[in-house]
């Protein structure tokens, strides 16, 4: 495989999709050496087949707002690869959503799901609709209109969506309800469902918890843990909230939290009481993080990211490309020893190079934030066997999965000098499972 040629061909065939190109380039650059050990892969044109999605659905969503005006948004579902299981990946509702972002997320999801060892392929979907500022009735009407098209492309053995940015328990509930009505069946077609209708315990917490479990495995390789460590967290949604919760539980101190308007810096640390306030502010009142600064009298920086503050550990948990090369250099200069990604591809390629050149611990999202989709897979299992596991059972399975992912990364990513390149390890481990499955299934 010539990685540069493959990437040039993709850019020619799919122009104006920078996020997708970035994701493919990052994977190709790390798997090329391992790929070239298998000439049968080239003969089967495997890399091109793996980079291009199986299919992409793009559709108009028309709905009525509370004033009786007709609104139009775009809806998408990218079914990337189902070599090892049904397509699996979230639905994102945000004004920034476009095909490039969803293709990148579906591509990444394929390898992330492979790493979990559970039978799940990769997919992603969403819309440029934003729930922010919309009434509950408007969100429901939009979701129902969205499902009028999506429902025909999904199913428990075909494609199992879940939540993502802008899609929480409320939106998943509306989607599941509409699917149930249209398909006339009650099946595990969605994950992240409410506990009352087939959801799994620990699912809301899973991405944040899983990230910290992975971080703990990394820290063990350096003979340390979270106790007394100062952590920077970006975001204030589901992933950030439960990341903070687990850091507090394990003895660390989180001093930042953010949203799209800016970030707060609380040198005393976000404790349990303050975290409860953030959860209430964000989940119930849909408020802004600056209100935290007003309530607790701490620093609020508008229009900025938290990465200039001093810390031991950085946990980017907001969105893609939120942490650039300059941010990375600031973190390294300030003594940061580890970066573990709760969001999908939050670090730019330049930032990743800075971390790796400095030889600090750096965990890419496809490994570190795989806890969310892992517990989604466990929810699928519970739905299929019509049983419900306890929180303790699910949490133990999550810990085991994250430990196994870490071991796979170390196996494939350890370099000659002993430094673990977790990006390479995650990409090669995830790729090899999918590649072998595709080879075994013929040219399809």
UniProtKB/Swiss-Prot annotation:
Keyword Oxidoreductase assigned to the entry: answer is: yes
List, alphabetically, the InterPro entries matched: Aminoacid_DH-like_N_sf (IPR046346), Glu/Leu/Phe/Val/Trp_DH (IPR006095), Glu/Leu/Phe/Val/Trp_DH_C (IPR006096), Glu/Leu/Phe/Val/Trp_DH_dimer (IPR006097), Glu/Leu/Phe/Val_DH_AS (IPR033524), Glu_DH (IPR014362), Glu_Leu_Phe_Val_DH (IPR050724), NAD(P)-bd_dom_sf (IPR036291)
- GO-annotated biological processes: glutamate biosynthetic process
The superkingdom listed in its UniProt entry is Bacteria
Lineage of producing organism: Bacteria, Pseudomonadati, Bacteroidota, Bacteroidia, Bacteroidales
Q: Which reaction does it catalyse?
A: L-glutamate + NAD(+) + H2O = 2-oxoglutarate + NH4(+) + NADH + H(+); L-glutamate + NADP(+) + H2O = 2-oxoglutarate + NH4(+) + NADPH + H(+)
Short name of one Pfam family for this protein? ELFV_dehydrog_N
**Its EC number(s):** 1.4.1.3
Instruction: State the CDD domains in the record.
Output: NAD_bind_2_Glu_DH
Q: If you read the UniProt record, what top EC class would you report for this enzyme, in one word?
A: oxidoreductase
Segment forming the signal sequence: none
* Record's subunit section: Homohexamer.
Q: Which residues form the active site?
A: 124
Question: What GO terms are given for molecular function?
Answer: glutamate dehydrogenase (NAD+) activity; glutamate dehydrogenase (NADP+) activity
Q: Which gene encodes it?
A: gdhA
Q: Which UniProt keywords apply?
A: NAD, NADP, Oxidoreductase
- Would you tell me the protein name for this molecule? Glutamate dehydrogenase
Could you say which protein family the record assigns here? Answer: Belongs to the Glu/Leu/Phe/Val dehydrogenases family.
Q: Which GO terms describe its cellular component?
A: cytosol
């Amino acid at each position: 495989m010539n990685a540069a040629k493959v990437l040039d061909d993709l850019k020619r065939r799919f122009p104006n999709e920078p996020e997708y190109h970035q994701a493919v380039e990052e994977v190709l650059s790390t798997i090329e050496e391992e790929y070239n050990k298998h000439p049968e892969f080239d003969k089967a044109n495997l890399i091109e087949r793996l980079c291009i999605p199986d299919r992409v659905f793009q559709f108009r969503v028309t709905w009525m707002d509370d004033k009786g005006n007709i609104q139009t948004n775009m809806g998408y579902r990218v079914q990337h690869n189902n070599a090892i299981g049904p397509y699996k990946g979230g639905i994102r509702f945000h004004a920034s959503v476009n095909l490039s972002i969803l293709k990148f997320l579906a591509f990444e999801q394929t390898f992330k799901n492979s790493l979990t060892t559970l039978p799940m392929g990769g997919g992603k979907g969403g819309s440029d609709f934003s729930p922010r500022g919309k009434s509950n009735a408007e969100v429901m009407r939009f979701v129902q209109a969205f499902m009028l098209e999506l429902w025909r492309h999904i199913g428990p053995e075909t494609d199992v969506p879940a939540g993502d940015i802008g899609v929480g328990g409320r939106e998943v509930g509306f989607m599941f309800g509409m699917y149930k009505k249209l398909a006339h069946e009650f099946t595990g077609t969605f994950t992240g469902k409410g506990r009352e209708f087939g959801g799994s315990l620990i699912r809301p917490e899973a991405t944040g918890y899983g990230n910290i479990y992975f971080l703990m495995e990394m820290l063990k390789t350096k003979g340390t843990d979270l106790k007394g460590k100062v952590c920077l967290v970006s975001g204030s949604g589901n992933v950030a909230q439960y990341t903070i919760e687990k850091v507090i539980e394990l003895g660390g101190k989180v001093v930042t939290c953010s949203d799209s308007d800016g970030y707060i810096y609380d040198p005393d640390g976000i404790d349990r009481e303050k975290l409860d306030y953030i959860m209430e502010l964000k989940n119930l009142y849909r408020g802004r993080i600056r209100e935290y600064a007003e309530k607790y009298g701490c620093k609020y920086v508008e229009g900025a990211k938290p990465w200039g503050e001093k810390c031991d550990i950085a946990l980017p948990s907001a969105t893609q490309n939120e942490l650039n090369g300059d941010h990375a250099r600031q973190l390294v200069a300030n003594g940061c020893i580890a970066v573990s990604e709760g969001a999908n591809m939050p670090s730019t390629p330049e930032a990743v190079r800075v971390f790796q050149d400095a030889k600090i611990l750096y965990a890419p999202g496809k490994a570190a934030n795989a806890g969310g989709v892992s517990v989604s897979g466990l929810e699928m299992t519970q739905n299929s066997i019509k049983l419900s596991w306890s929180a303790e059972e699910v949490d133990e399975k999550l810990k085991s999965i994250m430990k196994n992912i870490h071991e796979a990364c170390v196996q494939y990513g350890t370099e000659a000098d002993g430094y673990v390149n977790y990006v390479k390890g995650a990409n090669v481990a995830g790729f090899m499972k999918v590649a072998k499955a595709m080879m075994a299934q013929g040219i399809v």
